[in-house]
Each structure stands twice: as C-alpha cells, then as structure tokens.
C-alpha cells in the first residue's frame, strides 16, 4: 500500500472518530422511560470488558485496551461496562480501606481517556458481589481485621463499617480528577452511568428488603456527589416478593433481590437484567433455553415499561464460546428480541454482550471470550445489531 493511500485511510479514520466524538458529546439522560442524548433517543449495542483498568495499570499492556475500544468503535458499539474496583490482591486499586494505588487509578484514567477518543460510553461498577477482584468478601475481611464482629458476608448490606468503607470508595472514584484528561470523573460525559454493585445477592434475606434499604442509602449518597450521571444498581433481574406471581419467571430460585422494588427507588435511573442460560437453565435444550431467554427479556421489558417507567438494559448476556455456531444462533435470537422490543418506544434500550477481549488474553478468558475479527460471523452479528439500533434511534426521533 502506498504512503499516500495509507495517509488517506488514516485521515479518514481520524475524521470518523472526530465526528463520532462530536455526535456523542453531552450526558446521557432519561426521558419518558427511554435514554436521550442531546434531545434525541439513544439506543445502543455494547459490550462488557471487566478487565480494562486491571490491564491498563501496566503501561506496557495498554495497547490491549486500545485494541478492544478501537475495534468496538469500528464495529459500531457505543457502550462498554467495566470495573472501577479491584479490592486487595494483584494490581489492587484499593489496597486497604481508603488506601489506593495511584498506578492502578491512572490505568482507569487511561481507560476513560481512550473510551472518549473512540466515542464509547462507560458504565463503571463500584464493587463486586463475587470474590473476583476482592468483592464484598474483601470488605468483610478488612472490617474483621479492624475488630468488627461480622457473622457472614451478607452483613455487607447492613454493617455500618462496611457501608462506610464502600461510601469512601464511591467518593474516591466519583470525585477523581483524571490525570490524562484533567476532567473530574463526575464531570465527564464519557461515563454514561455508575453501577452500585455487580450482581448484588443476599442469601440472608430472600425478600429483597435488605438489599432495597442498601440500594436506597447508597443511591442517595451517589446522587449527593454527582447528579449529572445516571445510576443503576447492577441487578441480574431476579423477581422477589413485591409481585409474587412474577417469581415463576425466575430460573427456579431467588437471590435476595427484587427487580421491581429495587428499581422503583427514585435515585435509580434505569433497570438492568443479566442472563446466562448455560448456567441458569443448563438442563434444557438450546431451543428451550432460547424460549426461556425470550420470556426473561420480555417480562422485564413489560415491567420496566408499565411499572417502573424506566429504560431497561440487558447488561450482561453470553453463550459459551465452545460452540461458535450455537453461540451465533443464540446471539442473533437475543439481538432480534432486543431490537423488536426497542421498536416499541425505546424502553428496551440496548444490550451488553459478555465479553470482548484483545488478542493474546487467554489467561482472562472465562469461557465467553469474543475477539472481534477473530470470529468473523460473530463479529458481523454484533456489528449488524449496533447499526440497526443506531438507525432505530434515529427513526424514533
């Protein structure tokens, strides 16, 4: 390829990025149960890449972050969900309560700066239900070491010391001044939303009332620090006691949350659901799993539209990468369902597939890895959904 042609292609790509960034300026808001950007409906297709900050903490590995965000932008993806936590352990952001590794924080700074460059919005989560990257178990361990009497990890939602630890972390993240962009996180529209917790569960109170109290307290605290950004809980979508008949939609069990009551809290701006048929309804055939999946999505869309009156995001879904053909069929079906519901006014706002990675990241692969370009059929399905959702948003304007 000639130098002139390479220069032309590079120039066109930079122009494309400039136009994308200009179109994406401003904060995402909510109006009449749908997302809005600069006065127009906002629909999207997006992805999860939980590892971005963890990898970017090492400057020699930041090219992996750039690769994923660049490839996602080229494919038309516009929202990414990732972690703003790493509590204890390897490359910890929060080494101990209130003590942070600036090197890791600068990794998150880089993630936000790169996302802005490629026109991708971020949903940033504050803490994990699970032990990966610390989670609530790490908070409990810290509190016990400080002398607190805690009987189980689910006291995370009620114990004053644990709630104080989390509030300190939330404030540290929300008020952070980005070392690269020189913009405080709370003032940066690159961030679409904050997430209170990845997949909160409470085995000590299946009614969802304990988690509800915690969500109310934490949501009010976040909004006291930042009323510009949207806020969501991080829910998987399990129904609880508020509408008993809806519990039949659950995959056979409850987890101590209540999709309805937890999302009716005023400070929560939109609802989320997750879905993993390989795990939740593993004994069923692929066809039966697709039927269950459609019912799961549609039931929550009905409730988001009619009861919550808030947008709904399928914030995690995935299919094992062991069978590419079955995964492509599954993803096409899910995307078709999301699109068809989005046509009904935009309450169903988009979906975030789990998960995108860069080349050479096998050690991070949890069985759901997608490398854009490495599996052309899957990449095409993802990109097609991004473009039809963008076109649909324009038609709803």
Curated annotation (Swiss-Prot):
It is an enzyme of class 3 (hydrolase). This is Mannan endo-1,4-beta-mannosidase 1. It catalyses: Random hydrolysis of (1->4)-beta-D-mannosidic linkages in mannans, galactomannans and glucomannans. Residues 1-23 form the signal peptide. GO terms for cellular component: extracellular region. GO terms for biological process: polysaccharide catabolic process. Belongs to the glycosyl hydrolase 5 (cellulase A) family. One of its GO terms (molecular function) is mannan endo-1,4-beta-mannosidase activity. SUPFAM superfamilies: (Trans)glycosidases. Substrate binds at residues 83, 198, 276, 354. The active site is at residues 199, 316. It comes from the Eukaryota. The gene is MAN1. It is found in: Secreted. Its EC number is 3.2.1.78. InterPro entries: Glyco_hydro_5, Glycoside_hydrolase_SF, MAN-like. Keywords: Glycosidase, Hydrolase, Secreted, Signal.
């Amino acid at each position: 390829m000639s130098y002139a042609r390479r220069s032309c292609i590079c120039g066109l790509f930079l122009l494309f990025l400039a136009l994308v960034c200009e179109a994406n300026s401003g904060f995402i808001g909510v109006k009449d149960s749908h997302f809005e950007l600069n006065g127009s409906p906002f629909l999207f297709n997006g992805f999860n890449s939980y590892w971005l900050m963890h990898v970017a903490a090492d400057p020699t590995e930041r090219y992996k972050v750039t690769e994923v965000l660049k490839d996602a932008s080229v494919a038309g993806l516009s929202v990414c969900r990732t972690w703003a936590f790493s509590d204890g352990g390897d490359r910890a952001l929060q080494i101990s309560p209130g003590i942070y590794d600036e090197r890791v924080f600068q990794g998150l700074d880089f993630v936000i700066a790169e996302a802005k460059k490629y026109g991708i919005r971020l949903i940033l989560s504050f803490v994990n239900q699970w032990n990966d990257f610390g989670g609530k178990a790490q908070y409990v361990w810290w509190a016990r070491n400080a002398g607190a009497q805690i009987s189980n990890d689910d006291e995370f939602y009620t114990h004053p010391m644990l709630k104080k630890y989390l509030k300190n972390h939330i404030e540290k993240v929300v008020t952070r001044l980005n070392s690269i962009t020189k913009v405080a996180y709370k003032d940066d529209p690159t961030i679409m939303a904050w997430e209170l917790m990845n997949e909160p569960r409470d085995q000590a109170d299946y009614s969802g009332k304990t988690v509800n109290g915690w969500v109310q307290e934490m949501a009010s605290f976040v909004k006291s620090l930042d009323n510009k950004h949207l806020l969501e809980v991080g829910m998987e979508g399990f129904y609880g006691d508020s509408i008993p008949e809806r519990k039949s939609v659950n995959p056979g069990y409850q987890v101590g949350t209540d999709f309805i009551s937890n999302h009716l809290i005023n400070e929560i701006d939109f609802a989320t659901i997750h879905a993993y048929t390989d795990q939740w309804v593993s004994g069923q055939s692929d066809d039966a799993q697709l039927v269950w999946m459609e019912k799961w999505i549609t039931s929550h869309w009905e409730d988001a539209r009619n009861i919550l009156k808030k947008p709904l995001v399928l914030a995690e879904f995935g299919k094992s990468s062991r069978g590419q053909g079955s995964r492509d069929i599954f993803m096409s079906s899910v995307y078709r369902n999301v699109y068809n519901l989005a046509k009904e006014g935009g309450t169903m706002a988009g979906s975030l597939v789990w998960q995108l990675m860069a080349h050479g990241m096998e050690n991070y692969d949890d069985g759901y890895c997608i490398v854009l370009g490495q599996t052309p059929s899957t990449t095409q399905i993802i990109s097609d959904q991004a473009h039809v959702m963008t076109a649909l948003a324009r038609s709803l304007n």
